[in-house]
Amino acid sequence: MRLYIIRHADPDYENNTITPEGHLEAKALARRMTREKLHKIYASPMGRAQHTMQYTADALKLKSTTENWTAELETWRADQNKYGVSMIWDVPGEKIRGGEKVPHHHDWHEHDPFNDAKLKQEYEYICAQSDAFLLRHGYERKGHRYRCVKPHQERIAVFCHGGFGLTWLSHLLALPLPMVWSGFWLPPSSVTTVLFDERSKEWAVPRCIGMADCSHLYEAGLPIRPRGIKTNFD
C-alpha cells in the first residue's frame, strides 16, 4: 500500500478555505495526483483541506471520505511569551535540541514544553485513530510495525494539515515527535509518500519514499509559499 499525506494548499485561515494562489496549487496538485492512479481519497473536515481535495476528487471522479481525526491540532498551543510561537509544533529547534539530552521516541513527553499530560493524551488519541484507520485498510499495528492482515497495492491519499501531518508521520515512522516537528516542514499542497514496505508476507513497515514533494508546483511554474516557516526562507 502507498499512503499519500497531502497538506492543504495555501490557506486562508480566517475564512477556513484556500487563497486564490491556493486554488492554483490545488489544480496543479490534481494534475499530478491523476498520474498516481489513486484508489481512495480521504480528507480532514476542515474547509482548507476539503477545498484542496475537491480538485483531485473531481479529476479522478472519486468520492471522498471525511476523517475527523485528521483535523488540524488547533488546541496544541505553546507559550507565546516564552517561545514566540502559538502552536506547539513551531517551538524553535534551538530550544528542543539545546539541552544535554534530546527527546527520544519513548520520552519526548517528559521534556519541556512537551511535558503536558493532555498533550501526551491527545497524541495517543491520534495514534489510536491511525491504527484503527490502517487496520481498516488491512494493516494491524504491532509495536512499531504492521502485521499484514489483508495486504494490497492500493494507493490512498489523505488531505490534511501541516501540524497534523508531521505528528502522524512521527507515529508511522516511530520517530520522536519534537524532532519531527523541528526537523521537517510540509509546504502547502506538498505530497509525502509512505510505502508500506513488505519484506515478508507477515510484516509491513512504513517507509517514507518521498517527503514534502512539490514537483507539481515546479511543473506549473508556481512558487512554494513559506506557510509555517518563521524566518529566512528566501
Give, region by region, the residue ranges found by the protein language model.
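Active-site metal-binding loops of divalent metal-dependent hydrolases
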Residues: 9, 162, 212-214
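Glycine-rich phosphate-binding loop signature in dinucleotide/nucleotide-binding domains
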Residues: 35-37, 137, 141, 147-153
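Gly/Ser/Thr-rich loops at beta-strand to alpha-helix junctions
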Residues: 46-48, 162-165
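Short glycine-rich phosphate-binding loop at a beta-alpha junction
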Residues: 39-45, 145, 155-158
